[in-house]
Amino acid sequence: MGERANFLKGEVRKKFEAAAMSAIDAAMLVDAVVHLGIDHCFREEIATALRSVHEDEEGEFGSCDDLHTVAVRFLVLRQHGLWVSADVFDKFRDDKGSFSKSLLCSNPRGLLSLYNAAHMAVTPEEKVLDDAIAFARSHLVEAMIGELRSPMVEQVSRSFDIPLPRFSRRLESMHYIAEYGQEEEGHDAQILELARLEFELVRSLHLRELREICSAEYGATGEEAFAFIANMTENAWRKINQACMEMDPAMLPAFKVAVVDLSRSIEIIYLGGKRDAYTFGSNLKDLVTSLFLKPCA
């Protein structure tokens, strides 16, 4: 797995180094590797690419009238600490300063990119970004009721809960790895394969570190470490039960319910430590089916 990942890293570096790559292609490539959670493999290449993207204020991007492209450039530059003015979105507004419905409402992909990019506002004076959020959200809601399809409907739903710039990078990459190959255009098979391999390699590393921590702390073997963690879970439940019994009566009952329900959710998602149903949703299939589809006996 490691050898294949290293080979793919070399192939992706070639994409960054391609002399014919335009500033727009560079921005899209950076966005893809960041979104898929493999940007740590290409820090130098990303820095070089972003310099060309940043310097292209009046070039390709200056004449570009594609909302998705302009929003992606805005997002990746601000994510990496490079200043770009919110005025770049003025071309999508009418004479009254409002975002143009005729230009944008039929472009849900662009609206989602605008919605996420606008959450990179840095001052209250950037009112255009506040307007962008309100405009994009209202029209994306309409699109979700109508023509929006998977995987975009899931991406919009996540962004409404927590906008992309504020969402957990690890969790978003997990979702996006499953969605990237379904996109109608622009996906790269080698980048996707690398993202999958890197995700598994990092997860394996985390599991190994967890075993090593328990082994170092308590002198336990790998199997003993997992058993110890399972025992910690049992003890945590006992402490939760005790805390609920001893909770101040003045405490809102809803708070007690929320604490216990959160713990229950974690227990179900990870199925008592036996399977990871958060990463692999199929592990919850039988439970969800029994809860929502099967009639009571």
UniProtKB/Swiss-Prot annotation:
Top-level taxon of the source organism: Eukaryota
Molecular function as annotated in GO: terpene synthase activity
Lineage: Eukaryota, Viridiplantae, Streptophyta, Embryophyta, Tracheophyta
Alphabetized UniProt keyword annotations: Cytoplasm
Main location: cytoplasm
InterPro entries reported for this sequence: Isoprenoid_synthase_dom_sf, Terpene_synth_N, Terpene_synth_N_sf, Terpene_synthase-like, Terpenoid_cyclase/PrenylTrfase
Segments traversing the membrane: none
Cell compartments where the protein resides: Cytoplasm
Protein name: Inactive beta selinene synthase
Family classification: Belongs to the terpene synthase family.
Assembly behavior: Monomer.
GO CC annotation terms, alphabetical: cytoplasm
